[in-house]
């Protein structure tokens, strides 16, 4: 209950902040937020990754969706938004609450939510400029399938501590891909 109230308050504050700010400064704000999220996710580890080597799994991250050379800025921003949205959803479950230290989980969720707000403003701004709906749908579907594989893995492993550790490492990897995509976008601007 405390997590829900804290998260609700954070959502309200962050929503107000995003409504008051105009424009799309994606490269700077999102990149910093991504780094903070990576640091928090790194701090969330509870068990040694070496004790979970037998639980490793290839989730087949859709690397081509993080290749900023393949598509327009609007599509890249949509992919980043979907990746952060799916990460937020994954770490907002009851099973996730049981797996992680609550204050770190709240900070991580708040950071993701802020990134979602920043990205939503950019999606609205960029999609009006560049229309690539079919490519966007394919890219977003690839990201959703990736997170579906992660969720199925957690279910199959009964949300064990090692399963969550493997997923935590995988999400760190996907956030790193996201950071690299942002660097490429910055170079294009």
Curated annotation (Swiss-Prot):
PROSITE patterns: INTERFERON_A_B_D. It comes from the Eukaryota. It is found in: Secreted. InterPro entries: 4_helix_cytokine-like_core, Interferon_alpha/beta/delta. One of its GO terms (cellular component) is extracellular space. GO terms for biological process: adaptive immune response; B cell activation involved in immune response; cellular response to virus; defense response to virus; humoral immune response; natural killer cell activation involved in immune response; response to exogenous dsRNA; T cell activation involved in immune response. Gene3D superfamilies: 1.20.1250.10. The keyword Secreted applies. Disulfide bonds join 24-122, 52-162. CDD domains: IFab (cd00095). This is Interferon alpha-10. It comes from Homo sapiens (Human).
